[in-house]
Amino acid sequence: RAGLHTGECELIGDDVGGMAVHIAARVADGAGASEIHASGTAYGTVVGSGLRFTALGSRELKGVPGSWPIMQLIG
């Protein structure tokens, strides 16, 4: 399973952090085995690429304000 989001990250020693990393992890939490979920933000960056997505609706992500549209990559 994987969760995709795009945004600013911070290099913290040998690791990365920041809100974008946190959001990607929360998006991944909702994915099942062999599924790839993407935030609406990540989806918006690949529209027109030929990748196919289905909308899963909006979801509240733990520790993140607001409601986030979530998409599933299907091909």
PLM segments and residue spans:
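Catalytic beta-strand-to-alpha-helix segment of the class III nucleotidyl cyclase homology domain
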Residues: R1-G75
